Design a protein with these regions (language model features):
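Structural signature of the two symmetry-related core transmembrane helices
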Residues: 72-86, 165
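Helix-to-loop junctions at the C-terminal end of transmembrane segments
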Residues: 57-70, 154
């Protein structure tokens, strides 16, 4: 376990900081939407924008990783996430916020793909479970810490948005300075939804229902 952490500390440190920012901004936007008196339809639309970007990023980013590599993709989309949160502070209206949430979703799913593919490349059959369990533990702890930051901020002001941007930008530092080589990209293999359903109907339906529940809870 300690050897795994030693070999992946830069990756996990940057990801932990990023998850703090992620947890903070998700709750911040919900509270600020109430303060700005956005109607329920507008709030639902802007929070759903995250998952629109998430879906779009999941289908396009693997090709981009193949062209420019894991580290550049992580850096580029952490920067985009840092930029998109500032849109919320500058343009306080549902349309601008929806656009910003699409950018955020696209950026974060890109980072998730980089993380998970990088970890799977480093893992063996013996260590894969340990690596992925650490990854999920850091994800949840980071989001929890980010949520707590809401208690020490004033959501009606612009400073919390700047703090999120600072966290997202600082997440780049350990990744860009790591001595570890990024994984070599392998040829992509694709499976469509029909193929996935034929392979495992129950798992496909379960993932769909889990996604519905997760997106609803995350957007509250």
């Amino acid at each position: 376990m300690f050897k795994i952490l030693k070999n992946s500390w830069a990756l996990f440190t940057g990801y932990f900081v990023l998850m703090i920012a992620h947890g903070f901004q998700g709750n911040l936007l919900g509270v600020r939407s109430v303060i700005e008196e956005f109607n329920f339809m507008a709030t639902g639309a802007l929070m759903s924008g995250y998952f629109v970007g998430y879906f779009a990023g999941a289908s396009t980013v693997p090709k981009l990783i193949g062209k420019v590599g894991h580290i550049r993709v992580f850096a580029a989309f952490a920067s985009m996430a840092s930029l998109s949160i500032l849109i919320h502070a500058v343009f306080v209206n549902p349309i601008a916020w929806t656009f910003a949430r699409v950018l955020t979703g696209f950026s974060l799913v890109s980072i998730f793909i980089v993380m998970e593919s990088w970890l799977n490349d480093r893992a063996t059959n013996r260590t894969r479970g340990q690596l992925l369990s650490i990854y999920m533990f850091i994800t949840l702890i980071g989001v929890a810490f980010g949520t707590l930051l809401l208690n020490f901020s004033s959501p009606e002001k612009y400073e919390p948005f700047i703090l999120v941007s600072l966290l997202l930008s600082s997440a780049l530092i350990p990744i860009l300075l790591t001595k570890r080589k990024a994984p070599k990209f392998r040829k992509l293999g694709f499976i469509d939804i029909k193929g996935l359903y034929r392979t495992s109907p129950l798992a496909t339906l379960s993932m769909f229902c889990t996604g519905l529940i997760h997106s609803a809870l995350f957007s509250l």
